[in-house]
């Protein structure tokens, strides 16, 4: 295959396992399964060795919750000529397959199926000179499977057809599917009309319903071309729908991330904890059911000489507790409500405290130094001068974002064979950056939430989302007025910060801390940089969080939220119905509240600026910032 350059971070999203991408030769490729990523026979030139230690990264909380032993950075490509003295980790590539397999001649319309491993552009065997190009139609199902369009079965109206005569594709009139005709040399002809139709609930599609002449439905076979010739056994049985290769719903990556938090106690030095996890001490701790300071000193006296027995015992307790949690998580099926409940509260508490770690530096702003009008809305404002985020690819979905598949099912979609015990992994990237953390005042929030008009307004959106959960099999998500308000606030703040701090909107991300789990109510948001090098970023975002700078930015953002260029329509839709993806927004559109999808953890859903500034259409005084 030709080498197509791609950013390492893009191999997590949007070009992870099972995703389609267009190479520099114009061909469409599908990223291969994780089994092939660090395979010396597939991913490297002959004679090159792979040292995995260079790519392994640790994030203890995310490892525990996802049930893996470590994460791996996508490999970077190193051309042999630039590293002539090196023999390790040279010429590592991410294997891809040419998909879709069906090609069409632009001159004569000849259709021909090619192998997944085809390297060069094929020439038409009828024209001899013209190069064939891939067709633009594929099929997929809601379980994430992907297939070539069934050209032969479609034209013969029979999924069990035995005809192997030559096929061709022609146009008669307009370029819509209705005027594209599939023909077979046996005399069969059929247009592509209605192949992309599907019912609202997804229970039937034009392709599944109309392919066969008989009432028999054409259903998904479970095809997974990213596994190459090692296809999983067993049919899927769901209806399949046709789609264009460049359609946005062909691939939705499922990523999970965690902000680095130090593992420490008042007694155990952080360097000792790290030493126990990366040195031979870790193997000794794992292999022994009984470990104490004296036993560890007996085996490794030089390593532990600088530390006291009390420090060793404290560090041992931290590491052993982590290992037990890791072992119990291996077979865990993650419920994503619990996922957030286990991950976010600890981050929330740490961001409210001063931190001075190499990879987490937090400075608290005295709330008294904030403008008097604004300080009543917030209880904590922190400047996160340095942070590290680990972002892992957990799985993917097609047709609709989100998936009801369990964690283990998602892993099976990316691995043909599960990794051996002790070597389970998922691909991830490390992002260093900076941010601003704001915690809203709990008393003011509770007082605001008590208004019946607010509950009535949010109820419409909650009910609409419940319908989407049922019809699209989404995992349950608890929505509240608090969540919608804080989420919308994060969006307008991101949009305003782009004018002040020098970062584009796509360079900033939100991390919402809004829940009511275990009696602990979270009500905060972290706005942080989504990309940066190993040393972090330049500090422009943190500078905007200082007193005297932050207040004008927030007031400007709220002032702009009062009027949208689509008003009064935007606000009226919020009062009467819904808009945006799956109608899951109220008064929020591209002109006022939406941000790049990579910046929003909810896919630009669950927004309503009326909860910030009130509803002038109905006259309801429901704005939090009155």
Predicted regions and their residues:
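C-terminal interaction appendages of subunits in large macromolecular complexes
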Residues: 182-186
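Nucleic-acid endo/exonuclease domains
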Residues: 203-207, 248
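Extended, well-ordered protein cores
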Residues: 1-155, 166-173, 178, 212-626
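Short Cys/His-rich micro-motifs in 6-15 aa windows
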Residues: 128-131, 188-195
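Extended acidic/polar, glycine-enriched regions
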Residues: 189, 196-198, 225, 236
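Short loop/turn motifs enriched for small/polar and acidic residues
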Residues: 200-201, 530
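Short, surface-exposed linear segments at secondary-structure transitions and domain or protein termini
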Residues: 158-163, 204
């Amino acid at each position: 295959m030709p080498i197509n350059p791609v950013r390492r971070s893009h191999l997590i999203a949007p070009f992870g396992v099972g995703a389609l991408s267009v190479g520099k030769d114009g061909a469409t490729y599908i990223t291969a399964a994780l089994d092939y990523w660090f395979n010396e026979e597939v991913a490297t030139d002959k004679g090159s060795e792979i040292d995995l230690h260079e790519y392994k990264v640790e994030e203890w909380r995310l490892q525990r919750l996802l049930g893996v032993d470590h994460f791996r950075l996508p490999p970077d490509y190193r051309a042999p000529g630039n590293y002539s003295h090196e023999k390790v980790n040279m010429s590592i590539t991410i294997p891809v397959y040419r998909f879709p397999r069906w090609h069409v001649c632009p001159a004569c319309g000849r259709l021909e199926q090619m192998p997944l491993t085809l390297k060069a552009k094929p020439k038409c065997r009828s024209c001899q000179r013209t190069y064939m190009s891939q067709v633009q139609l594929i099929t997929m199902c809601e379980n994430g499977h992907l297939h070539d369009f069934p050209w032969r079965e479609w034209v013969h109206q029979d999924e069990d057809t035995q005809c192997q005569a030559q096929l061709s594709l022609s146009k008669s009139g307009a370029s819509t599917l209705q005027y594209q005709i599939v023909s077979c040399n046996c005399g069969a002809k059929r247009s592509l009309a209605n192949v992309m139709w599907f019912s609202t609930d997804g229970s039937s599609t034009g392709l599944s319903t109309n392919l066969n002449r008989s009432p028999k439905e054409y259903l998904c076979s479970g095809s997974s071309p990213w596994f190459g010739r090692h296809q999983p056994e067993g049919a899927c049985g769901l209806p399949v729908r046709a789609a264009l290769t460049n359609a946005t719903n062909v691939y939705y990556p499922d990523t999970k991330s965690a902000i680095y938090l130090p593992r420490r106690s008042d007694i155990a030095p952080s360097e000792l904890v790290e030493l126990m996890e990366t040195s031979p001490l870790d193997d000794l701790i794992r292999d022994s059911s009984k470990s104490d300071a004296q036993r560890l000193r007996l085996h490794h006296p030089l390593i532990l000489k600088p530390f006291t027995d009390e420090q060793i015992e404290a560090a041992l307790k931290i590491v052993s507790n982590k290992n037990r949690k890791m072992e119990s998580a291996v077979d865990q099926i993650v419920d994503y409500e619990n996922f957030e409940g286990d991950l976010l509260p600890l981050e929330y508490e740490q961001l409210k405290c001063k931190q001075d770690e190499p990879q987490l530096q937090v400075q608290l702003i005295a709330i008294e130094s904030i403008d008097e009008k604004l300080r009543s809305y917030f209880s904590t404002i922190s400047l996160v001068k340095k942070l590290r985020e680990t972002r892992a690819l957990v799985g993917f979905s097609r047709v609709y974002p989100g998936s009801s598949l369990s964690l283990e099912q998602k892993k099976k979609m990316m691995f043909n064979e599960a990794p051996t015990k002790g070597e389970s992994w998922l691909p991830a990237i490390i992002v260093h950056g900076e941010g601003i953390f704001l915690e809203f005042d709990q008393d003011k929030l509770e007082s605001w939430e008590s208004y019946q008009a607010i509950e009535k307004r949010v109820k419409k959106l909650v009910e609409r989302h419940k319908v989407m959960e049922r019809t699209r099999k989404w995992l349950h998500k608890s929505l509240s007025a608090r969540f919608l308000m804080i989420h919308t606030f994060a969006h307008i703040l991101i949009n305003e910060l782009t004018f002040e701090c020098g970062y584009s909107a796509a360079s900033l991300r939100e991390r919402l801390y809004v829940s009511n789990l275990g009696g602990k109510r979270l009500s905060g948001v972290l706005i942080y940089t989504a990309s940066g090098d190993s040393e972090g970023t330049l500090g422009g975002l943190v500078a905007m969080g200082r007193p005297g700078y932050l207040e004008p930015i927030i007031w400007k953002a709220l002032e702009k939220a009062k009027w949208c260029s689509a008003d009064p329509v935007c606000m009226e839709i919020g009062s009467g119905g819904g808009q945006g993806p799956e109608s899951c927004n109220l008064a929020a559109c591209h002109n006022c509240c939406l941000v790049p999808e990579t910046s929003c953890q909810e896919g630009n859903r669950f927004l309503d600026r009326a909860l910030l500034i009130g509803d002038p259409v109905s006259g309801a005084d429901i704005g939090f910032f009155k």
